[in-house]
């Protein structure tokens, strides 16, 4: 199974997507979008920006764990990760996203 973006509609009518790795694990979650077209644009932004140097920022969380965010060229966050036990694990997550996004499919579940 290849990596895939899953586009969903929330109960409040907004849209969001998750990037699932080939093993089915969620490796990136989007922000909420008011329109489906905006969410689809967000997916394209993730595809583009995930390949850009300096687009990812690994950060410590308040509980001592780590996560990363993916930013567009305008500085807006277009995706974030789950929490990882260590900075090294979060950095490995970044590499997973970089590898997965160029060929990831799309499952429209909205």
UniProtKB/Swiss-Prot annotation:
Location of the region described as Disordered in the Swiss-Prot/TrEMBL record: 91-110
Keywords: Repeat
UniProt xrefs under Pfam families: DUF1508
Spans of repeat Sequence: 10-58, 61-109
Homology family: Belongs to the UPF0339 family. Duplicated subfamily.
PANTHER family named in the record: PTHR40606, UPF0339 PROTEIN YEGP
Protein name (database record): UPF0339 protein PA0329
The organism of origin for this protein: Pseudomonas aeruginosa (strain ATCC 15692 / DSM 22644 / CIP 104116 / JCM 14847 / LMG 12228 / 1C / PRS 101 / PAO1)
